[in-house]
Amino acid sequence: MTRRVQLLCAWGAPVSMIAFAIGWVGFAGFLPPLSPSDNAAVIANIFAERRTGIRFGAIIMMVGTMFWIPWAAVVAAQPRRTERDRGVLPQTQVGCAVAATAIVIIAMLIWVVAAFRPDRPPELIQTLSDLGFVISIMPFAVFCVWNVALGLAIFADDGPAPAFPRWSAYLCMWTALLYVPGGALAFFQTGPLAWNGAFAFFLPAIAFFIWLIVMTVLTLRSINRPPGEDHEFSTIPASRQVPA
């Protein structure tokens, strides 16, 4: 992978963040998320009033989410320089990014369907709205595994010039822990553990975007490292190197 391609992939996270800011906040008006305690008539009215914005916002977020995959791939490729198994942890990270992208795209499509026909029964629109928010916010396990896999890869990168500083592995682990409250939204319609609450939505979302920013900066730094500091083959013992 050339340096230019790596740099393009590394900028995928900022692109996705901008897309979410424009789509989720600007067009759909889903910040804060719609209250799970609102009745069907209220939800149906919101989707009717914002039907164009919700559809545009969903399209923008679908496009932006796709940039998670190249970003995850280039981030996963950095500690791989010294990973002994040459594949398990990087593949896990990319697999989680693909799963996370698919989850978000499915949620966006559900909201498009909910906004597509405002003359549907309010209860049906509410069901689609609920389904979209549950799918987009609740699947914390995918993001936890993604972060933990990257953290383990950073810990395993014990060469003389590791791609990422060791503290970033702890950041990955703590961030993964902060995603867990999102799973509680299945049991609450009000309060901090509802899908519009501080613990189920805002804390995981803020943690995720901080993680994206920090890992993007560290990845750009790793990519721009002088060639002399690249130790892709330096960890292979001389006795195991194949003579030319």
Task: Place the predicted regions along the sequence by residue.
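Hydrophobic, aromatic-enriched alpha-helical segments typical of multi-pass transmembrane helices
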Residues: 1-244
